[in-house]
Amino acid sequence: MRSLSNVAILFAVKNQSLKKQLQTFIPYIYSTTNINNNSDFNMKNFPQAVTEHPGENAIFIIYGLLDTPDTQKKVKDVCANFSALIRSIQNRFPDAKFSATLGFGADAWSKLFPDQQRPNELETFAEIRGDKHIAVSTPGDLLFHIRSKQMGLCFEFASIIDEKLSGVAVSIDETHGFRYLGGKAIIGFVDGTENPAVDEDPYQFAVIGDEDPDFAGGSYVFVQKYIHDMTAWNSLPTEEQEKVIGRHKFNDVELSDEEKPANAHNAVTNVGDDLKIVRANMPFANTSKGEYGTYFIGYAGKFSTTRLMLERMFIGEPVGNTDRLLDFSTPITGTLFFAPSFDLLGEIGG
C-alpha cells in the first residue's frame, strides 16, 4: 500500500484530462487537498473531506434512526456506497468542488456496529452549563455534511441519501448554508480565521492518528446551530462589535493585546497553537421569519480539544470570563459524531 507521501505528487499533475483519470482511481484525493505530503497515514486510512474549504453552499442533515428490521442493512448499504456516490457526482461535475461527509452518533455506532469497538472519544455530548449560557445537547444518529459550488448538486446527493434511508430514519434537522460576502458570518465578520493555516497541516488537527490506531484517519465532528439576535447585535457600534469578536470588522486584522478584551471571542476560543480544530461554519437564514444564524461544524482528531474550547466559551477561564459573543448568539443544538476513514466506512458497510 502506497503512503500518501508517494501519491501526493499527483497534485502537481498539470494535464486536466490525466487528473480526471487519476481521480477515478484514487478516491477523493482531489477533495482533501490539505493533506501534508509528509503524512504518515496510508491509503488504508484515507479520511473523508474533513479539511475542505466550507464551500459556496452546504446542506447539513441530522437523522434519527428508527428501530426496524431493515435499519442496519440500509445504513450499511449507504456506508458501502458512500464513496462511489461522491465520485459519481465529482466525475460528472469536476469543477463543482463537491464533497460529502458521513458521521455517526455514539448510540448509533453501538447499535449499528455491535462487533466494532467505539472510538476513544465518541460519546453522547454532555451539555455544558455555565452561569449565563448553556451548550445544549441534542440527539442525532447520522450526520451528512454536503458541500458544493452548486446547491443543485447538494440537493441531488441529499435526495439520494434520503431515498436510501426511507423507512429507517427520520430527519431531526436539515439546514441549508450559503457563503456570504466572501466568507463572512451574518454578523459581518470573517468566519474561520482561526483555522490552521495550510503550512500548519490542518490534517494533523482534524484527523485521528496513532493515539487510536483502529480509527486512524477518522475525525470527531461536533455541530451546533446558533441563532443570532441581530437586533441587539446591530445596535452595537462597530468598535464595540470588534471588541466582542477580537478583530477589526473591515480588514479582519486581530486587535492588539491592549485593545482586545479578555472575553473577546477569539481570545476565549484560543486554547493554544497545538490545540486547534478545522471549522467549516456556514451562515443560514430564514429572512421572512427573522431567523439568522451560523451552523458551527468543527472537525478534530481529539474531541477533548473542541470540548475545552466550549468550556472556555460557556463556563469561562477563569470561571465567569465567558465568550461575549454568546450574549448575541444562542446554540439550539449540540451533537457529537464520528466520521470514519473511507476504508473503515467501506469495512463497516460490508
Residues covered by each model-derived region:
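N-terminal mitochondrial targeting presequence
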Residues: M1-V13, L18-S31
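Long, histidine/aromatic-enriched segments associated with O2/redox biology
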Residues: S31, F41-G350
